[in-house]
């Protein structure tokens, strides 16, 4: 009986802890960012990242901010259109996040262009978005002052500036 109660308590405590933005998330270009895929439902996002998120009040789209601690900047932003993920991107410059071929947040611009392949550069307010489109998905590598600041996924042929 004690073992069953202990197991129940551990499961109760561990479940919410597992649902949070990843500390060292991964970009799979054209597919996922931090385990989130375009088209997922809001319920799937909450199951993966938890219920602790801020809501952007001034954004055109419904936007949730999953940060590591309340009112901090680093984490993951998720935009929803009709309760489905239409964009997902890192917030601020979360350490430990990576993309294939050893590309990590903080890499210099030349590493991004070498490792991510041919990219289209768009100028945003205060940063640049180096992008690559597939048929359905655009992958963005956000550059600030010559360094990789973050990653993003959104529908192909949309504005990557956020």
What is the predicted function of each stretch?
Residues 14-15:
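N-terminal signal peptide c-region/cleavage motif recognized by signal peptidases
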Residues 29-36, 96-103:
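Second-shell loop/turn segments in exported
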Residues 26, 92-93:
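Short, 15-30-residue, compositionally biased linear elements
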Residues 88-90:
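Functional surface patches built around histidine and acidic residues
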Residues 20-27:
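Cleaved targeting-peptide boundary
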Residues 21, 40-84, 93, 103-162:
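A cross-family detector of function-defining hotspots
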Residues 1-4:
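Positively charged n-region of N-terminal signal peptides that target proteins for export
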């Amino acid at each position: 009986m004690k073992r069953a109660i202990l197991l129940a308590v551990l499961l109760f405590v561990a479940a919410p802890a597992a649902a949070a933005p990843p500390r060292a998330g991964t970009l799979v270009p054209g597919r996922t960012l931090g385990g989130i895929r375009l088209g997922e439902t809001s319920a799937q996002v909450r199951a993966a990242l938890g219920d602790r998120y801020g809501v952007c009040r001034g954004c055109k789209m419904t936007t949730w901010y999953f940060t590591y601690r309340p009112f901090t900047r680093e984490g993951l932003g998720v935009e929803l259109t009709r309760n489905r993920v239409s964009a997902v991107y890192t917030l601020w410059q979360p350490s430990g996040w990576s993309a294939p071929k050893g590309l990590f947040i903080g890499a210099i611009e030349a590493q991004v262009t070498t490792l991510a392949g041919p990219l289209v550069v768009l100028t945003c307010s205060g940063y640049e978005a180096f992008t690559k489109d597939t048929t359905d998905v655009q992958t963005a590598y956000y550059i600030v002052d010559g360094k990789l600041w973050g990653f993003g996924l959104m529908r192909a042929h949309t504005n990557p500036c956020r």
